[in-house]
């Protein structure tokens, strides 16, 4: 991930393990979560007894802050310069900045890793999302050496399996593959957005790994897609939202196109061979 050295990285059996570990390791009592976002962050802090506030923008640096960058589900991105300035102000009161960069492999330009180490900043990275190997259970916390040692002590020995270490090391070293994969994902995401807008959905945001769309009849569309064997994500925060991931083989693209066209009463889009 471009860190200055291995003493800035703690390995874990998935980012979720780190999300649950941070409240007990840091002990912060007042935490803001930039939302709406991945619900497990707020849940972990609330379970620790912390006072948690969901905020729509960067709050004053009078408490610790957790955000996902780029955000899940809407792809919102916060400039790393703003985050660095916030962290420096918050450091004066011993507050933490935790940035979950689970989807930053497709947005390396917004990563906070290049400014590390900062004493009060922790960056989380997820191996499985970009590499398509969620079941491998491999995640990382990037932070100042002292915090890395605390997290490693909390994780305990043998936190990461041998296969995860071997596969992760090989995959992360293959930067040529990563560059090609970013280009491939961008092409396929353009195709997916075409399908969705052609079926009358609005695009709220997203990344090249997922897209958040809205529709006045989102629940009806959700049930229609389930009937076609297609599962998308619904959200309590907004009943009009649906999050779509990228289809895989061409038959999955065809099935999605057919289902969307049937719902919208349109003709399926001819195969454009987006790559």
Residue ranges and their predicted role:
Residues 10-13, 17, 120-203:
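PLP-dependent aminotransferase class I/II
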Residues 46, 59-61, 73-133:
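Active-site pre-lysine segment of PLP-dependent enzymes
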Residues 81, 227-228, 237-275:
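PLP-dependent enzyme catalytic core of the Aspartate aminotransferase-like
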Residues 24-44, 51-55:
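Conserved PLP-anchoring active-site segment centered on the Schiff-base-forming lysine
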Residues 32, 64-68, 98, 140-142:
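Structural motif
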Residues 4-29:
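Conserved beta-loop-alpha segment that forms the PLP phosphate-binding cup at the N-terminus of a helix
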Residues 186, 194-228, 246, 250:
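Conserved PLP-binding catalytic core of the aspartate aminotransferase-like
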């Amino acid at each position: 991930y471009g860190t200055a050295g291995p003493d800035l990285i703690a390995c874990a059996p998935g980012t979720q393990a780190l999300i649950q570990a941070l409240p007990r390791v840091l002990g912060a009592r007042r935490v803001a979560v930039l939302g709406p976002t991945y619900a497990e962050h707020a849940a972990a802090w609330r379970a620790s007894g912390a006072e948690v506030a969901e905020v729509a923008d960067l709050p004053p640096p009078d408490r610790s802050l957790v955000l996902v960058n780029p955000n899940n589900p809407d792809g919102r991105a916060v400039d790393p310069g703003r985050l660095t300035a916030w962290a420096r102000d918050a450091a004066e009161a011993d507050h933490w900045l935790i940035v979950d960069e689970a989807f930053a492999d497709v947005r390396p330009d917004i990563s906070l890793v290049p400014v590390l180490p900062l004493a009060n900043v922790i960056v989380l990275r997820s191996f499985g999302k970009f590499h398509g190997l969620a079941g491998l259970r491999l995640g990382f916390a990037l932070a100042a050496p002292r915090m890395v040692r605390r997290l490693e002590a909390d994780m305990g020995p043998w936190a990461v399996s041998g296969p995860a270490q071997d596969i992760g090391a090989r995959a992360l070293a293959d930067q040529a593959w990563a560059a090609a994969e970013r280009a491939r994902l961008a092409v396929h995401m353009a195709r997916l957005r075409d399908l969705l807008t052609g079926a009358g959905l609005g695009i709220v945001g997203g990344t090249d790994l997922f897209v958040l769309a809205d529709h006045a009849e989102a629940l009806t569309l959700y049930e229609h897609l389930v009937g076609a064997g297609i599962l998308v994500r619904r959200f309590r925060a907004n009943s009009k939202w649906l999050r779509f991931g990228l289809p895989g083989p061409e038959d999955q693209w065809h099935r999605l196109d057919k289902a969307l066209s049937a719902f919208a009463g349109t003709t399926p889009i001819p195969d454009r061979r987006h790559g």
